[in-house]
Amino acid sequence: MRNDETIERRQAAARRSDVVVLTACPDYSEEHARAAVCNALEKWPGLSGIGPGVRVAVKVNLVTGASPKKAVTTHPQLVTELCRQLTMRGAEVTVGDSPGGLFTREALRRAYRESGMEPIEQTGAKLNDDIETENVTYPGAAAAHVFSCTSWLRKADVIINFAKLKSHGMMRLTASVKNLFGAVPGTTKPEYHMRFPNETAFANMLIDLNEALQPALNLVDAVVCMEGNGPTAGSPRPLGLVLSSENPYNLDMICAELTGMRPEDVPTIRCAASRGLGPSGLQEVEISGERPEQWKLTDFRQADGVRVTFTGNGVLGRLQEAIFRSAMQQMPKVHPSECIGCRKCFNVCPARAITMVKGKPKIDRKRCIRCFCCQEFCPRGAMKVHRTLLARLLQ
C-alpha cells in the first residue's frame, strides 16, 4: 500500500459517520427491497461521491452457493436494487465475494448461479471474475499487518460491504465486520484460522482487515436472518430490517442488540471496543429510523456455546478461567446419520484434524483448533457445535 493511500484511508476513517440507519423491509419483493435500499442510500453521506466512472465494489456474503430461501447469503433482490441505483448514477459496479474453497472462475460462476445472483447483470453491474490476489498492509494492526486480498476489491474506488445477519459458531455473530473475511481468497482462509486460532486473535484480525480496506458503506440484510447452527446450516428467521452505516462496529452493536446477544459475548464487538474503535454499549450508538427495541428477537437461537469470564485478578483468577474454559470447550461433532460423506469438512480443515473412516469424518481432538470451518461448510448441516454437559447446564 502506498504511503499516500494509507494517509487517505486514515483520514476517511476519521471522517466516517457513526450513525446506524434501520429501515423496515417486510420481505424481498421488488417494491420493498427498492424502498429499503433507496432509503439507506439517501441517508448515506457518501452518496454524493457516486457518479459517472466511479468504480464501486459490492462485497456480498457468498460464503457458499445456496438458494436465497436458506438465508445463507445476501439476498440477490437487495443486491439487484443496490446495483440498479448505483448504475443509474453512472457508477461502474462489480459484485463479488470469495467463497470457501477454490478461488477460481468456475467456482465463482457456480456460486453466483446457485445463489441467484446472475440476474444482477441485467442492471448493468458485473459479477466479478477477477481471481488475482495481492498483499495489503495495515501498519496499525493488532494482529495481522499484511493480508492476502482479492485484487478486485483493491481496484475499486469505493467498497460497499453488504453482509447477511447470521449466528456463527466461532464468532457468535456474523454481520458487517466478519463479512470482510471474504476479501481473503478462499484457499488462503485456513491459514488465517491456523495463525489466529482463538476467538480474540481472530476477531482482532478481522478488525485489522476492516481498518485496512475501509469500506465506504456497510449494509446488512436482516430481512430474513439466520439463527441456530449458523452461518450455513441454521434456520431462516424473519426480522424485516435493512441496516446501514459507515461505521461497521456501531452497526454490529445494533445487530447484537436485535438478536439478544450481549456485546461482551461477541468477540469482534468486544475487541473493537477495547481498541477504541467501537462502542462498548448500545447507549453510545446514534440511531436513525426504526428503533431496535421494537424489533428485538428475544427468542433468537444463538449458535451453541457459552462464554464465562472471571473478573478475579491474579494467578487464581486466570487459573479458574482456564479450568472452566476447558470444561466448557465447545467443539465440532459429526452426526453420522446426516452425513453424506462428501469430504467437504476433510478438505477445508486448516489443522488437518479430520480423517475419513469408512466414508465418514473422524476428528482428532488433539489437533482440532475449534475454528468450526467444518461446521460452516457442511452442505447438509451434519457437523454440529457440541457443548459439554457443564456448558449445557450453565446455558
Mark where each language-model region is.
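N-terminal and secondary-structure boundary signal
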Residues: 1-336, 340, 346-351, 355-360, ...
